[in-house]
Swiss-Prot record:
GO terms for biological process: apoptotic process involved in mammary gland involution; calcium ion transport; cell differentiation; cell morphogenesis; decidualization; intestinal absorption; intracellular calcium ion homeostasis; intracellular receptor signaling pathway. It comes from Homo sapiens (Human). Belongs to the nuclear hormone receptor family. NR1 subfamily. Residues 246-264 are annotated as: Interaction with coactivator LXXLL motif. The gene is VDR. This is Vitamin D3 receptor. The lineage of its organism: Eukaryota, Metazoa, Chordata, Craniata, Vertebrata.
Length: 427
């Protein structure tokens, strides 16, 4: 306390532990903070200010060294004032009445400015908050971060140049629910209330495929050891995308035909978007649980895809990862991707555009409200650019899929749902 008394400057508040009770340096009562350059209670603060303003002169009736406590601080004003000076209280810190008034006005003005800024700051409406909550719930219900279902796919087989490797789970079975083998016909309401949708739900849509150039190289079956497993993975992912899409606010208002068109045209794009959650920039791989389900570029090539697709896909995944999207932004981007009015074959483009506009406005408002700078700078524009990148990836995927599916020995390894969504079923 003596060291504090010798100081003529404001002590650093960081030097004091907030958890330690603060004591008035004059009387030992509970202190309320630094007043006039010393830690004091409200009583001694007021006493010092009044004494300095009145230029009061006090005389001690005793020896001039009274011990000042909370109980007797009113008994000897001279020793109390002396104690105030001893601990470092300075009259230069006392504001005049005019200065006090100006300070109060400044504080009031600052509060008013903050209130005005707060009122002008964009806020998510109740409807927008509801949209985000629904999409988050839809994503959580249709995306399993533990990837526990992967063991039910046909097992991954990684054949090396020097010889074959055995599947990690020889007895793993290919579950019908993942392969889309259902033979039931499409109902009037194509998007049903169930979480899963079988491949026949798309059967009413007459697909028009462009004539594809004959593949220049016939793929060897030994080079496609990962095709069965990844076909099951994609089939499973398509079902999850369908489940997510059904919960997008406004999606069920569309006709069954438009729902099918949107799902077929966006499925691979949304799968690529979703896969970013498992993408790791350290080794440019997708890690879905244990090492059996860690997918590298070599695994994708063993499913029949070339670097013309894989290289831009990796670039896309890295760029998307670097945006550090919030989960709310991620689910909104997926929904916007699905509900795109410019997909070929849609009938009610105006209604689809209205739904997408509502989602886009929600995303822009969320970024302004909840995504702090510098990450929010041009974030919406960057996210829309990612959708454009996905269109290019989709186009390249379609080319490579057609090359693959025109080979009967390859198409046999695909699931009915994959065949139905990505192109005409090969007979």
């Amino acid at each position: 306390m003596e060291a504090m008394a010798a100081s003529t400057s404001l002590p650093d508040p960081g030097d004091f532990d907030r958890n330690v009770p603060r004591i008035c340096g004059v009387c030992g009562d509970r202190a309320t903070g630094f007043h006039f350059n010393a830690m004091t209670c409200e009583g001694c603060k007021g006493f010092f200010r009044r004494s300095m303003k009145r230029k009061a002169l006090f005389t001690c009736p005793f020896n001039g060294d009274c011990r000042i406590t909370k109980d007797n601080r009113r008994h000897c004003q001279a020793c109390r004032l002396k104690r105030c000076v001893d601990i470092g209280m300075m009259k230069e810190f006392i504001l005049t009445d005019e200065e006090v008034q100006r300070k109060r006005e400044m504080i009031l003005k600052r509060k008013e400015e903050e209130a005005l800024k707060d009122s002008l700051r964009p806020k998510l409406s109740e409807e927008q908050q509801r949209i985000i909550a629904i999409l988050l719930d839809a994503h959580h219900k249709t995306y399993d971060p533990t990837y526990s279902d992967f063991c039910q796919f046909r097992p991954p087989v990684r054949v090396n140049d020097g010889g074959g490797s055995h599947p990690s789970r020889p007895n793993s079975r290919h579950t019908p629910s993942f392969s889309g083998d259902s033979s039931s016909s499409c109902s009037d309401h194509c998007i049903t209330s169930s979480d899963m949708m079988d491949s026949s739900s798309f059967s009413n849509l007459d697909l028009s495929e462009e004539d594809s150039d004959d593949p220049s190289v016939t793929l060897e079956l030994s080079q496609l050891s990962m095709l069965p497993h990844l076909a099951d993975l994609v089939s499973y992912s398509i079902q999850k995308v369908i489940g997510f899409a059904k919960m997008i606010p406004g999606f069920r208002d569309l006709t069954s035909e438009d729902q099918i068109v949107l799902l077929k045209s966006s499925a691979i794009e949304v799968i690529m978007l979703r896969s970013n959650e498992s993408f790791t920039m350290d080794d440019m791989s997708w890690t879905c649980g244990n090492q059996d389900y860690k997918y590298r570029v070599s695994d994708v090539t063993k499913a029949g895809h070339s670097l013309e697709l894989i290289e831009p896909l990796i670039k896309f995944q890295v760029g998307l990862k670097k945006l550090n999207l919030h989960e709310e932004e991620h689910v909104l981007l997926m929904a916007i991707c699905i509900v795109s009015p410019d997909r070929p074959g849609v009938q009610d483009a105006a209604l689809i555009e209205a739904i997408q506009d509502r989602l886009s406005n929600t995303l822009q408002t969320y970024i302004r409200c909840r995504h702090p700078p510098p990450g929010s700078h041009l974030l919406y524009a960057k996210m829309i650019q990612k959708l454009a990148d996905l269109r290019s990836l989709n186009e390249e995927h379609s080319k490579q899929y057609r090359c693959l599916s025109f080979q009967p020995e390859c198409s046999m390894k695909l699931t009915p749902l994959v065949l139905e969504v990505f192109g005409n079923e090969i007979s």
